[in-house]
């Protein structure tokens, strides 16, 4: 009798368990909202997962925070005749909560490089501009002031964001936008897992500031993959991957506006690759992996360079001018360690005015085991079904 009661109890439990399993509901994927962002944003906004049109220069003003859900897509339109860009002004914040599986994508409907202005952020972190001044006017056609003393400026958090077909050239002939432009942005800002894809200018450009860039891909951008000036001095940047294809100049262009600074940025784990047949923008004669000019400096380690050929105008590391050679190379303010070059690209060189480049002991070292950037592939690093990590 006890055995029968026990058996019935077990059967009862099994029935309940099965019933509970069968009663489980499968969550229905939520439909994306459809919307438009335009004009000045002066109050906090939460943009739910959706498809949005980006129209004109959208400015997140001081005191406002815009938060964007994972998987959202923002589309600019070249054909409407407006200049489109997403601008975060000093005091405003942009929080983008993308994920590896659901990145937030900013693109343009015709897929034309240079068709819009990308993401532009301003802060009040320190800069050192031309003549040693600590404030300057932006080069993006918006003529905004930047520079200050707030090393920990916080412009928000950008995680798993892809910007496509940006790098707008402004018709005045001197102004230009990039994929991502960071004007005096501070170390309180989070930049992680960002992609600049097929823009008509630089993928990423820093104008001074102290912000760090962690896990970044610059793919197919016409000018430089990574570029900075005005005394940018981020210390914790790592895992930068550049792939130049079609058109491209330098993997990294490093300058300091002719200021002989006693500080410099630090970047670890760098991959710089160039596809065969890639041309330079405007038929430029040089297309080096890394170029230092106008007193540019820095500390860089675990570097993998590939595809910069034996052409006389291509070297792994170029020292562009006499002042940079004398004040930065010879004074040990440029350090490149654990450099691996796949192929026969010359290691380093100068120009017609810099006939000899000789790094002090320990300031330039090579390694056969350097790995460069260490990135995990996913939807964030995939376009049209193809991985950007070549």
Identify the meaning behind each predicted range:
Residues 8-10:
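Hydrophobic alpha-helical targeting segments used for export or membrane insertion
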Residues 14-17:
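C-terminal motif of bacterial Sec signal peptides marking the signal peptidase cleavage site
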Residues 24-29, 33-48, 54-61, 66, ...:
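Extracellular beta-rich repeat passengers
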Residues 73:
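Catalytic metal-binding/acid-base residues of hydrolase active sites
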Residues 102-103:
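Glycine-rich loop(s) and the adjacent beta-strand/alpha-helix scaffold that form part
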């Amino acid at each position: 009798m006890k055995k029968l009661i026990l058996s019935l109890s077990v059967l009862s439990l099994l029935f309940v368990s099965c019933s509970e399993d069968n009663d489980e509901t499968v969550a229905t994927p939520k439909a994306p909202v459809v919307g438009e962002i335009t004009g000045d944003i002066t109050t906090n906004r939460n943009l739910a997962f959706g498809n949005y049109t980006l129209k004109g220069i959208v400015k997140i003003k001081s005191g406002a925070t815009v938060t964007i859900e994972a998987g959202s897509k923002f589309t600019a339109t070249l054909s409407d005749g407006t200049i489109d860009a997403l601008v975060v002004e000093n005091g405003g914040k942009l929080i983008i909560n993308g994920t590896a599986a659901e990145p937030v994508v900013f693109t343009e409907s015709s897929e034309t490089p240079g068709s819009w202005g990308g993401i532009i952020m301003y802060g009040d972190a320190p800069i050192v501009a031309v003549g040693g001044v600590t404030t300057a006017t932006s080069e993006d056609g918006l003529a905004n002031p930047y520079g200050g003393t707030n090393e920990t400026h916080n412009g928000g958090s950008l995680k798993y964001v892809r910007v496509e077909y940006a790098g707008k050239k402004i018709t005045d002939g001197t102004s230009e936008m990039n994929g991502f432009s960071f004007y005096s942005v501070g170390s309180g800002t989070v930049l992680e897992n960002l992609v600049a894809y097929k823009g008509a200018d630089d993928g990423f450009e820093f104008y001074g500031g102290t912000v760090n860039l962690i896990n970044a891909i610059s793919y197919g951008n016409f000018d430089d993959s990574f570029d900075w000036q005005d005394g940018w001095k981020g210390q914790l940047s790592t895992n930068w991957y550049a792939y130049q294809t079609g058109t491209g100049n330098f993997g990294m262009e490093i300058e300091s506006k002719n200021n002989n600074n006693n500080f410099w940025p630090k970047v670890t784990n760098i991959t710089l690759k160039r596809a065969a047949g890639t041309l330079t923008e405007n038929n430029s004669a040089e297309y080096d992996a890394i170029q230092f000019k106008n007193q540019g400096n820095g500390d860089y380690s675990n570097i993998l360079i590939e595809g910069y050929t034996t052409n006389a105008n291509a070297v792994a590391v170029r020292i562009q001018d006499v002042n940079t050679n004398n004040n930065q190379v010879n004074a040990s303010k440029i350090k490149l360690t654990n450099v691996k070059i796949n192929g026969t690209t010359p290691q380093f060189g100068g120009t017609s005015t810099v006939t000899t480049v000789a790094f002090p002991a320990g300031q330039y070292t090579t390694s056969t085991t350097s790995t460069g950037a260490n990135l995990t592939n996913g939807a964030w690093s995939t376009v049209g079904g193809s991985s950007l990590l070549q």
